[in-house]
Amino acid sequence: MNVRANRVSEQMKKELGDILNRKIKDPRLGFVTVTGVDVTGDLQEAKVFISILGTDKEKENTLLALEKAHGFIRSEIGRRIRLRKVPEMSFEIDNSIAYGNRIDELLRDLNNDQ
């Protein structure tokens, strides 16, 4: 990824966090955190990695809400970031936080057993 793509990625991460927490009023949208954004070098596509707190059903509902609000989110990004073309976004669940929590839990169990 080039320097410009990195800057756009960081700016999108910041703006997406704000949009998801303040602008979207969908009740299906649970506790969502934007953990990262990968933008292609030509700034045409962006993978948005999100962490969702809740059950699998709540995660599924949150993804549905994000897909429904996709156009609104894209237009908001276009208003906030000066780009010739707003990248096409896809949302993916980032399981690294859950994985880290599971490792912490296993380590605590191991320490309690000793």
UniProtKB/Swiss-Prot annotation:
Its main location: cytoplasm. GO terms for molecular function: ribosomal small subunit binding. One of its GO terms (biological process) is maturation of SSU-rRNA. It is found in: Cytoplasm. Coiled coil: none annotated. Keywords: Cytoplasm, Ribosome biogenesis. Signal peptide: none annotated. Gene3D superfamilies: 3.30.300.20. GO terms for cellular component: cytosol. Monomer. Binds 30S ribosomal subunits, but not 50S ribosomal subunits or 70S ribosomes. Belongs to the RbfA family. PANTHER family: RIBOSOME-BINDING FACTOR A, CHLOROPLASTIC-RELATED (PTHR33515:SF1). One of several proteins that assist in the late maturation steps of the functional core of the 30S ribosomal subunit. Associates with free 30S ribosomal subunits (but not with 30S subunits that are part of 70S ribosomes or polysomes). Required for efficient processing of 16S rRNA. May interact with the 5'-terminal helix region of 16S rRNA. This is Ribosome-binding factor A. The lineage of its organism: Bacteria, Bacillati, Bacillota, Bacilli, Bacillales. The gene is rbfA.
